């Protein structure tokens, strides 16, 4: 899969995010919360040698081009006129996810106790800045 990313055989990276609680899963609803760790996995792939240029292209630029017909703005790059929706990663802040850190409705992660070489520290959604660890508003658009 890593070679497919580098050579372009894999067009884009995405994550499923089904933030069901453990109780809902036990009752037969399938799916796991993965959005909380997507940025951390990008840091891991970079740490394993996949260039950031490739990761940004596959996780942001290309998906935005593919799905642009469904949006009302220009997403996927950092250019004047683009919609400011992005994640800010600290690639030097290693962390191990703990249940108490999970921000999604699920309240758990399949990667609890898994170490990552970096993490998302801030998100920007349509120009509104949010602190990732607490989901606190940093700045309005």
Label every model-predicted segment:
Residues 1:
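Phosphate/diphosphate-binding loops
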Residues 4-7, 12-13, 17-91:
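His/Asp/Glu-enriched, well-ordered alpha-helical/loop segment
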């Amino acid at each position: 899969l890593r070679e497919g990313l580098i050579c372009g055989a894999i067009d884009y990276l995405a994550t499923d995010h089904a933030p069901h609680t453990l109780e809902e899963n036990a009752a037969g609803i399938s799916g796991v919360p993965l959005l909380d760790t997507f940025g951390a996995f990008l840091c891991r792939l970079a740490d394993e040698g996949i260039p950031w240029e490739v990761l940004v292209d596959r996780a942001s630029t290309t998906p935005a081009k593919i799905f642009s017909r469904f949006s009302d703005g220009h997403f996927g790059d950092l250019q004047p006129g683009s919609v400011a929706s992005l994640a800010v990663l600290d690639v030097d802040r290693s962390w191990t996810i703990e249940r108490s850190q999970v921000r999604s409705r699920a309240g758990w992660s399949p990667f609890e106790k898994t170490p990552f070489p970096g993490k998302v520290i801030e998100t920007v959604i349509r120009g509104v800045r949010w602190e990732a660890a607490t989901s606190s508003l940093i700045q309005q658009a």
